[in-house]
C-alpha cells in the first residue's frame, strides 16, 4: 500500500513541475508557461517564456548593443486573440572588448500579455515559433516551435511565487523622491 501511495505522489509531483512546452537546443532550453491552467474569454493572461542557457552562455536583450540579436517570437493564435510583449527585464552589461553588449547570463524570463475576445472556443491551440542566439566565445543560433492545447491537462501553470518573481524581475520600481517638478506650466 505504501508503495502505491509513493508512486501516486511521485507521479503528481512529476506532473506538477512539467512545463507546458519545452524546446531543447544545443546550449539552451526554452520553456513556455501559461499564467494559469485556464484561459477565459474577455481576459488578459500572462504567457511566460523562460530561456535557460548552459553555464557561461548568454543571450541578448531587445537592444543588444554592439553585436548580437534579440530573441524573436512568432505566435499562431486563434481568431480574435492578441498578444503583446515580451516585457523585457533590465539587462546585464556583457563586455566583449572593444564591444559592449547587453543581455542575460544563464537565464531570462520574458512575460507576454495574451488578450482574449468575448467568445472563445472550448478547445484551441496556441503555437509558438522562437529564434534566439546564445553566445560564449562564439554565437550559436537556437530555434524551435510547438503548440499547446487549451484546455490542457496534467500540466501545472506558474505558481503565485513564480509570478511574483517574474513581476519583480521585469517591472522596475520608480523612486518618485528622485523626481522634481521644475515648472507647473503646461507643455505643448
Task: Give the predicted meaning of each segment.
Residues 3-15:
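Sec-dependent N-terminal signal peptides
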Residues 18-188:
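Extracellular/lumen-exposed scaffold segments
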Amino acid at each position: 500500500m505504501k508503495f502505491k501511495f509513493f508512486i501516486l505522489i511521485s507521479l503528481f509531483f512529476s506532473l506538477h513541475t512539467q512545463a507546458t512546452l519545452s524546446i531543447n537546443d544545443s546550449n539552451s532550453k526554452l520553456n513556455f508557461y501559461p499564467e494559469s491552467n485556464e484561459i477565459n474569454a474577455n481576459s488578459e493572461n500572462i504567457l511566460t517564456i523562460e530561456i535557460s542557457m548552459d553555464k557561461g552562455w548568454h543571450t541578448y536583450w531587445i537592444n543588444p548593443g554592439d553585436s548580437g540579436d534579440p530573441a524573436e517570437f512568432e505566435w499562431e493564435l486563434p481568431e480574435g486573440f492578441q498578444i503583446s510583449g515580451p516585457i523585457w527585464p533590465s539587462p546585464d552589461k556583457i563586455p566583449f572588448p572593444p564591444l559592449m553588449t547587453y543581455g542575460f547570463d544563464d537565464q531570462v524570463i520574458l512575460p507576454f500579455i495574451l488578450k482574449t475576445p468575448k467568445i472563445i472556443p472550448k478547445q484551441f491551440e496556441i503555437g509558438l515559433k522562437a529564434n534566439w542566439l546564445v553566445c560564449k566565445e562564439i554565437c550559436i543560433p537556437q530555434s524551435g516551435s510547438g503548440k499547446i492545447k487549451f484546455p490542457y491537462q496534467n500540466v501545472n501553470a506558474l505558481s503565485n511565487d513564480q509570478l511574483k518573481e517574474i513581476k519583480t524581475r521585469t517591472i522596475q520600481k520608480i523612486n518618485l523622491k528622485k523626481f522634481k517638478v521644475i515648472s507647473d506650466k503646461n507643455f505643448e
